Amino acid sequence: MDNKNFQSKTGFNLENTYLTLPNIFFSEQNPKGSKNPKLIKFNTSLAEELGLNEEVLNSDFGLNIFAGNETFPGIVPIAQAYAGHQFGHFTMLGDGRALLLGEHVTKDCKRYDVQLKGSGRTIYSRGGDGKAALAPMLREYIISEGMHGLGIPTTRSLAVVSTGEEVLRERFEQGAILTRIASSHIRVGTFAYAAQWGTLEDLKSLADYTIKRHFPNIADNENKYILFLEEVINRQAELIVKWQSVGFIHGVMNTDNMVISGETIDYGPCAFMDTYDTNTVFSSIDYAGRYAYGNQPNMALWNLARFSEALLPLLNPNLDEAVNIAKKSISNFSKLYKKYWFNKMRTKLGLFTEKENDELLIEGLLSTMQKYEADFTNTFVSLTLNKFEDEKVFSSDEFKTWYALWQNRLKEENRPQEEVRNLMMNNNPYIIPRNHLVEEALKNAEKGDFTFMDNLLEALKNPYSYSKDLEKYTKLPEKSDTPYVTYCGT
């Protein structure tokens, strides 16, 4: 089947412009394929958004694409090369178990990578087997869709297939492949790789390609590389604020896990915070708390500093001048983050305008929440509904004092109560992909029962809907002596 007929049948409008880059950035390779694949999950709503033929892709024809048994006609799959600072240590990486099948261009000219994750070993695999297990792939499916529902930029999952073979992790698990959709997979680590092992022309080619793809409005500007750095800094500031505002903890914010597009990517050891504590860590390998909830803004800044270092030769031919430009741009991150953070927190408290003491009001609430171990999500739900259950935070003197200050601040706004409530409801999710709910969904799914997962996914499409039907997803996990721990399974 040629590309035209394939496009007509599937809806995929395929290209691979990444192949126009110098060949140090990729390695051509076909997926290994699956002997006995089974379609486990197909994202109908995403397929519809992308203009794909849901019926065809939800059949055996689509299964063979998602299982790596069929590639796109005329398009060469590639594994992408990149480096990464893993917990601060620089190393060569690359797609060790993923292949970019191609780029789908929608009718409104939006371009998306179509990537298979878990499709077999590549030239960059190092010691890994190139495969993925079912539970981690389903976990990424659930959480990425949850993030999308929350309005947070993210890669998404089009399909998950089981491969019919077992993979050895701590135990034998069902093998799987996830089809990931992303604006692109160009990472901070891609630029670090180019700066370390490529030529100046290689670095320039990558920057020009990325600007044309993600920031076309600056492509013809004589200062485009400086503007490029500033645009990436701004997007990351916006993204991290959105993470923080819902208690999302990525868990492994290495430079290879920060993409230039400003999407959330690589959901390995991520989790959502229940009890508000800025020191919260879930990842089994984050012993020192480098990527703790409260440290995520600093780690984003650290990553962006590494990005600016990679761009130095493009910022100015004079190294000292380039360093000064980079420092000036990087210094804006904290200002942008602070601005976006307090703006977001105002909306969570129903405030439409900015006042001098708002920062103290916001910090006062958060410090009280931390002191009394309040649930992050449900505290803001309680404020939104103005209904307070028998939680120790709400009966504390600190909260009562804070509440009076907040009510006075709301009076200064002089807005109708309905407007305030709507603003809060649109910014305080009623539900999130709570860790215990995700684990229950995965536990059942591994046994072949997808009922709970399907219901959870449906609920997560509308997390800001304060519906009685969603109340069961607001319940906290049972108290346990064993802390919740996540692993880099994805």
UniProtKB/Swiss-Prot annotation:
Positions bound to ATP: 94, 96-97, 117, 129-130, 180, 187, 266
Effect of residue 171 to K: In strain: 8-6
Effect seen on changing residue 48 to K: In strain: 8-6
Reactions the enzyme catalyzes: L-seryl-[protein] + ATP = 3-O-(5'-adenylyl)-L-seryl-[protein] + diphosphate; L-threonyl-[protein] + ATP = 3-O-(5'-adenylyl)-L-threonyl-[protein] + diphosphate; L-tyrosyl-[protein] + ATP = O-(5'-adenylyl)-L-tyrosyl-[protein] + diphosphate; L-histidyl-[protein] + UTP = N(tele)-(5'-uridylyl)-L-histidyl-[protein] + diphosphate
Enzyme class of the recorded protein, top EC level: transferase
Phenotype when changing residue 347 to A: In strain: NCIB 10662
Keyword vocabulary terms for this entry: ATP-binding, Magnesium, Manganese, Metal-binding, Nucleotide-binding, Nucleotidyltransferase, Transferase
Protein EC: 2.7.7.-, 2.7.7.108
Cofactor dependence: Mg(2+); Mn(2+)
Active-site residues from the entry: 256
Single GO MF descriptor: AMPylase activity
Aminoacyl-tRNA synthetase as UniProt keyword: no
Entry-linked InterPro entries: SelO
Residues annotated as binding Mg(2+): 257, 266
Effect of residue 201 to D: In strain: NCIB 10662
Record has Cell membrane as a keyword: no
Homology family: Belongs to the SELO family.
Role summary: Nucleotidyltransferase involved in the post-translational modification of proteins. It can catalyze the addition of adenosine monophosphate (AMP) or uridine monophosphate (UMP) to a protein, resulting in modifications known as AMPylation and UMPylation.
HAMAP family listed in its UniProt record: YdiU_SelO (MF_00692)
Cited NCBIfam families: PRK00029.1
Protein name, entry field: Protein nucleotidyltransferase YdiU
Originating organism: Clostridium perfringens (strain 13 / Type A)
